[in-house]
């Protein structure tokens, strides 16, 4: 689209070589220069916070020797997905520092982008599964048995990882490195074999990975909020509220954060599709979509490092688990000893 490097750093991996006859628009060089300077540092910051934060979350969930409840199973899988995702971000930071000249070879071009694409699906499907579980607990409590729900949660998580991996296969197959003589770089790009792939990709990206899950999330959380309002009088009589209410508050916050981070990305991805099929034209739209995709993409990336912060500041039960883990890992204080016994120990210690 633009005369800048034909690489849109998106988890949808929709970057392509521009057509030979594409109009070269260069109306925002200062903005691109700023992005090239700022984005690598921003990516590394996301990677650092996301790596430490999600490792911390996994340790809190997995170190105590006890069975995870259903919500914790889903949240642990979400943290694992975010952890795998942020491990690929340093490659993109180096790619931007290198003026979009991909230095890591064709295999890593495919693997890193495949991981990013899989994370997009795994994350949104896990958010749907979490919302559905809260819906069953609060709206249909009699129909949900804890043991059965735990088994279903494990199976659901396995299926989500498998489906996310399968949906990333086209990215793994179609991503490659290719020389771009006009820019004097070798870019990691997505090569779509036919124009029909543009439509198939936008259906996969905007409908399967966002609109359908969004409809499910809205349905489940609408009924969750209605159920919580119906229990408001009961919860007032309980000190601090029920355990289910605390867990639900955490999950609702995670859902809102996910939608805020990812909605702009899908909006600009749809605009990019409209530009590809020439439904919108002109240098204004080209620059607007190019820059918007870059910014929206990295707003989406922040979600992977934001979730651990939400656990700490919103998840009261999570903070309780952190404190319990701290006490478990901290050596217990020694029993007090008499002064005479202490004197005897010192004499034995200093004896030559």
Curated annotation (Swiss-Prot):
Q: What is its main location?
A: membrane
One GO cellular component term: plasma membrane
Membrane topology of the entry: Multi-pass membrane protein
Q: Which residues lie on this side of the membrane: Cytoplasmic?
A: 63-72, 132-153, 228-250, 316-352
Q: Which residues are glycosylated?
A: 13, 21, 184
Which cysteine pairs are joined by S-S bonds? 109-188
Which subcellular locations apply to this protein?
Answer: Cell membrane
Question: Which residue intervals are topologically Extracellular?
Answer: 1-41, 94-110, 175-206, 272-294
Q: S-palmitoyl cysteine lipidation: where?
A: 329
An example GO biological process term is: inflammatory response
Recorded GO molecular functions are:
bradykinin receptor activity
Query: Which residue spans traverse the membrane?
Result: 42-62, 73-93, 111-131, 154-174, 207-227, 251-271, 295-315
Alphabetically ordered keywords of this record = Cell membrane, Disulfide bond, G-protein coupled receptor, Glycoprotein, Lipoprotein, Membrane, Palmitate, Receptor, Transducer, Transmembrane, Transmembrane helix
**Name of a matching Pfam family:** 7tm_1
Q: What does this protein do?
A: This is a receptor for bradykinin. Could be a factor in chronic pain and inflammation.
What family is this protein classified in?
Answer: Belongs to the G-protein coupled receptor 1 family. Bradykinin receptor subfamily. BDKRB1 sub-subfamily.
- The name on file for this protein is B1 bradykinin receptor
Species this chain originates from: Macaca mulatta (Rhesus macaque)
Q: Which gene encodes it?
A: BDKRB1
């Amino acid at each position: 689209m633009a005369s800048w490097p034909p690489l849109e750093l998106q988890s949808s991996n929709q970057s392509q070589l521009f057509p030979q006859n594409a109009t070269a628009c260069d109306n925002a060089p200062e903005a691109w220069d700023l992005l090239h300077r700022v984005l690598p540092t921003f990516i590394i910051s996301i990677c650092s916070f996301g790596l430490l934060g999600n490792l911390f979350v996994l340790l809190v969930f997995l170190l105590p020797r006890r069975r995870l409840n259903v919500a914790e199973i889903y949240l642990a899988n979400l943290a694992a997905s975010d952890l795998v995702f942020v491990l690929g971000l340093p490659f993109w930071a180096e790619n931007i520092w290198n003026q979009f000249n991909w230095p890591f070879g064709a295999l890593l071009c495919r693997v890193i982008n495949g991981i990013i694409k899989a994370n997009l699906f795994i994350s949104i499907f896990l958010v749907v599964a979490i919302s559905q579980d809260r819906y069953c607990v609060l709206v249909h409590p009699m129909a949900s048995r804890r043991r059965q729900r735990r088994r279903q949660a494990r199976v659901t998580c396995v299926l989500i990882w498998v489906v996310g991996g399968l949906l990333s296969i086209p990215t793994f197959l179609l991503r490659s490195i290719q020389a771009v003589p006009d820019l004097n770089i070798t870019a990691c790009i997505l090569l779509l074999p036919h124009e029909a792939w543009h439509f198939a990709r936008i259906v996969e990206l905007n409908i399967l990975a966002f609109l359908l899950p969004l409809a499910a999330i809205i349905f489940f959380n609408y009924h969750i909020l209605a159920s919580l309002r119906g229990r408001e009088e009961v919860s007032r009589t309980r000190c601090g509220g029920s355990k289910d209410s605390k867990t639900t508050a955490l999950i609702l916050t995670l859902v809102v954060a996910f939608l805020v981070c990812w909605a702009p990305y899908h909006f600009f991805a749809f605009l990019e599709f409209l530009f590809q099929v020439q439904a919108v034209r002109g240098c204004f739209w080209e620059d607007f979509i190019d820059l918007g995709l870059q910014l929206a993409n990295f707003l989406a990336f922040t979600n992977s490092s934001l979730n651990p912060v939400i656990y700490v500041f919103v998840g009261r039960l999570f903070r309780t688990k952190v404190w319990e883990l701290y006490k478990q890992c901290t050596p217990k204080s020694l029993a007090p000893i008499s002064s005479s016994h202490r004197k005897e120990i010192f004499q034995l210690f200093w004896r030559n």
